[in-house]
Regions:
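P-loop NTPase motor domains
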Residues: 75-86, 298, 396, 409-467, ...
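P-loop NTPase motor core of the ASCE superfamily
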Residues: 139-142, 147, 471, 553-608, ...
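Anion (oxyanion) recognition and catalysis
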Residues: 180, 392, 503, 523, ...
Length: 847
């Protein structure tokens, strides 16, 4: 028994006063296991641009994913993995199919929010639809979810160690250079971005508003990384994650935040490791591990984090061990008992290959490949079956990591490997020995097409990646588009969505339609619908559209105007065939003389008079041929006097169906409208995008002079920031008229929807579309899935991608050509509802 003065004092106090100077029990402590205790992060060194962690240091890069690969890709990756990393370093490659799609949807929503009105309502409805795709499949038959693929590459080294800050910086520069050589963009992931990434991994509940993760440099990173409102229950074969469902869902008209409930808020997180891999694997086959491109059933039903963890051991020891293995297996394979062990010969050959690769400069690495899935609670078993089926179809075998679920989640965190996780995995026998070139071939760096930088058309890839596409992202060539899709492929909806997308972003749109498919949508969007009939009384005199002063000062402008006017006159004179060289010369002389004499006050009558006064018989024949378009002729009223209207509206649709029986007039009216749009382009700012869309172009662009006219128009459009879009049911239709063929040949972009099988065979046989076997397979696989989505193949400068157009009920109601739908909307407006409210009611969404 130990006696002390304090004990004696307590005994005396207890005896005299029945009390002591100290409490009867020690003070209670709150004991909670914190997920942040597993994180390595401490501080960020701004000078060295390195993270200094508890037991390591390193850097983190965010990289654009690879879109496919080839042998060169594998060689470059293998070379860097073999030579660019020092001994003891730990490399992590994380491919995260994130449920946070706000970085794509937000910039697309912003310009439409600024436009307000119907375009803001369309954007809100589309945003809700895409966010719904995150957790609910957009297809009733197969998984189809929206995902934003993020590729994170991190390199860390243990501390203390022999690798200096300067060596790490050199590794970073070498890694960035290697990625740039593959055509990938890489940028440093700073603390704010790292905190956001950890939040996406540990709190996947998706709200419309992006959470702001401000980095406080005066506090440790680990204490800022994990939200305080999540709960993680660790099981033997899963993690049960509970998050806060009350999140900011948007802001009202006054800018005040609105907080709503976001579901799901309970998740089943499971981790798997690779048990076996195929004997042979190429870098481009990694695309199969993000979801099959052609089989809908083999797509991921939930967010996943795929990780490759590499540890670079002592190469001398590793080489010595490899040499021993080679000698041992070789000697055993040459014994008499080898016939009872047939795999000995294979093992000997494999170690011989390893020995040769090591002598060639390759390295042996310790490797771990795993996958973590994040499913809404209750769906984990169904999702596990699909995930394992995807890997099994590619020849891989996944196994549950029982009792290692938390370690699997931590393995997804950048820089965790060098901070002690590598030692844990080595102790648990989770690291396999592989060649560095093999590791490069299986690196999970594949993703889907990310789109361009101009947020016009919003599409979703087959594996779920939302992306933007715009014809104006082509900086090297023109912005023109050729669109083809068979009946029932969704072509009409795509055309209307293209126009609404451009208008919502502030562009000016003119449509020349044949069939009234745009009538209701243009009226609902506040545009102008113009019908051409013989009794309409419109004037389209091309001379009156020209700016006199500018034509006098700008020679290029004047020549472009003359070229189009001459093509219009040529179309009047020879509607079925192209004018001869002599006739072109006579028309040129007559148009020039008329302009010099009368300027913009001239008319087709004056050109006819000049032709009639020429000395040649051909000139008088031309004057007679264009007589129907002169005063007193059948169509003279359309081209007399000053043009009766200007393109002042941002969205205008010209309906030509009433002129279908008069093809000679329709082609001239069409060319006059195109000339009017070209003049509107020259008068507006080049920063404003402009689109002219012609539906059923093969029929509309018939005529002898239309080819020449379209070529001139395409050149003018490119110069003034405009685009010409033409649409037909088949690519073969473009070859039915000179004008349509000229439109195709002057289009750098092509959008192909579902086609007939025999049509695709014609493409290949007649070499009308430059495509290899893969492109042909992609086009053959295009489909439309009812009202769920329609697929479009985008082919353009350095671009080949498949996107799905996903409509919301609000947009589908606007684009509907059903007269009853339009009448119902008007009826709701008469009852006092706003336009957006009326559309929502008819669409079935209530107020």
């Amino acid at each position: 028994m130990t006696l002390s003065l304090a004990a004696a004092r307590d005994a005396l106090s207890r005896g005299l006063f029945a009390d002591t100077t100290r409490p009867e029990k020690p003070q209670a402590h709150f004991g909670l296991d914190m997920l942040s205790d597993w994180l390595p992060y401490r501080v960020y060194d701004e000078g060295a641009k390195l993270y200094r962690n508890a037991r390591s240091k390193g850097f983190v890069l965010e990289v654009t994913p690879l879109i496919g690969a080839d042998e060169r890709t594998g060689e470059i990756l293998g070379q860097f993995f073999s030579e660019g990393l020092p001994q003891g370093s730990c490399l992590q490659v994380l491919n995260f199919a994130s449920p946070r799609i706000g970085s794509v949807v937000g910039p697309w929503f912003a310009p439409r929010y600024e436009q307000g009105g119907i375009y803001e309502a369309i954007a809100r409805a589309r945003t809700r639809r895409l966010y719904d795709l995150v957790w609910n499949s957009g297809s009733a038959h197969a998984p189809f979810h929206a995902r934003n693929v993020r590729l994170i590459v991190s390199l860390g080294v243990p501390v203390p160690g022999s690798v200096t800050d300067a060596e790490l910086s050199e590794c970073r520069e070498g890694l960035v250079g290697m990625l740039h050589s593959l055509g990938l963009h890489a940028q440093e992931l700073r603390p704010g971005g790292l905190l956001a990434l950890i939040d996406e991994l540990t709190s996947p509940t998706t709200a419309h508003e992006t959470d702001i993760h401000a980095w406080n440099p005066h506090d440790t990173l680990q204490s800022q990384a994990i939200r305080r409102d999540i709960e993680l229950e660790v099981g033997d074969d899963r993690l049960i994650l509970r998050t806060e469902r009350f999140r900011e869902t948007g802001r009202d008209e006054e800018g005040n935040p609105e907080v709503g409930e976001c579901y799901p808020d309970h998740f089943d997180v499971r981790h798997y490791a690779v048990r076996s891999t195929p004997e042979r694997w190429a870098p481009w086959e990694c695309a199969r591990l993000i979801g099959d491109m052609f089989t809908d059933k083999l797509r991921f039903p939930c967010p996943t984090a795929t990780m490759l963890c590499l540890v670079y051991p002592d190469q001398e020891a590793a080489s010595a061990r490899a040499g021993f293995k080679f000698m041992r297996t070789t000697s055993l394979s040459q014994t008499k008992s080898a016939r009872f062990l047939p795999k000995l010969a294979e093992q000997s050959a494999e170690w011989r290959h390893v020995q040769a690769e090591l002598q060639a400069g390759k390295k042996l690495v310790k490797l771990f490949y795993g996958l973590t899935s994040i499913s809404p609670l209750g769906q984990g078993d169904a999702h596990e079956r699909i995930i394992k089926a995807i890997y099994k179809a590619a020849g891989w075998d996944l196994a549950d990591e029982r009792f290692l679920q938390l370690q699997g989640l931590v393995a997804a965190f950048p820089l965790s490997l060098a901070d002690g996780l590598a030692d844990d995995m080595a102790r648990l026998k989770r690291l396999k020995t592989m060649l560095s070139t093999t590791a490069a071939h299986i690196a999970p760096m594949q993703g889907e097409y990310l789109g361009g930088v101009i947020p016009h058309l919003l599409l979703v890839g087959r594996r779920g990646q939302p992306f933007w596409w715009s014809p104006f992202e082509n900086t090297a060539g023109n912005h023109n588009i050729a669109i083809c899709g068979k009946s029932g492929s969704g072509k009409s909806v795509l055309l209307q969505e293209l126009c609404a997308a451009l208008r919502g972003a502030g562009a000016k749109v003119v449509v020349i339609d044949d069939g009234r498919s745009f009538e209701h949508s243009v009226k609902l969007q506040g545009g102008r619908f113009v019908e051409f009939t013989l009794a309409s009384g419109f004037s389209l005199n091309p001379f009156s559209m020209v700016d006199d002063a500018r034509a006098h000062e700008d020679e290029d402008y004047r020549l472009d105007c003359f070229a189009m006017i001459k093509a219009i006159v040529g179309q009047m004179a020879r509607p079925g065939t192209a004018p001869s060289d002599t006739e072109r010369g006579l028309i040129d002389r007559a148009v020039t003389a008329t302009w010099e004499a009368l300027g913009s006050g001239a008319s087709v009558d004056d050109v006819a008079h000049a032709l009639h006064g020429s000395e040649s018989e051909a000139g008088r024949d031309l004057a007679t041929a264009i007589a129907p378009f002169c005063r007193g002729g059948s169509y003279g009223g359309f081209f007399a006097g000053k043009a009766s209207f200007a393109l002042d509206d941002d969205f205008t649709v010209f309906e030509m169906s009433d002129l279908a029986s008069r093809e000679e007039l329709r082609s001239v009216v069409l060319s006059a409208i195109m000339f009017m749009t070209s003049q509107a382009m020259t008068r507006s700012s080049r920063a404003t995008k402009k689109l002219l869309l012609i539906d059923e172009a093969w029929a509309m662009l018939k005529g002898g002079s239309m080819g020449e006219f379209v070529e001139t128009y395409a050149r003018t459009a490119r110069k003034y920031g405009g685009a010409l879009a033409t649409a037909t049911q088949s690519l073969n239709d473009y070859y039915k008229s000179d004008g349509a063929r000229a439109a195709l040949e002057n289009s750098d972009w092509m959008l192909v929807l579902q086609q007939k099988a025999e049509t695709i065979a014609d493409f290949r046989a007649n070499a009308r579309l430059d495509m290899d076997d893969r492109t042909e397979t992609l086009i053959r696989s295009l489909k439309r899935s009812g009202t769920e989505y329609s697929e479009v193949f985008i082919k353009g400068p350095e671009t080949e991608a498949v996107g799905r157009l996903v409509l919301d009920p609000f947009s589908a109601t606007i684009y509907s050509s059903d007269p009853d739908t339009y009448a119902a909307i008007q009826d709701c407006e008469r009852r006092g509802h706003s336009l957006a409210g009326a559309i929502r009611i008819v669409a079935g969404g209530g107020q």
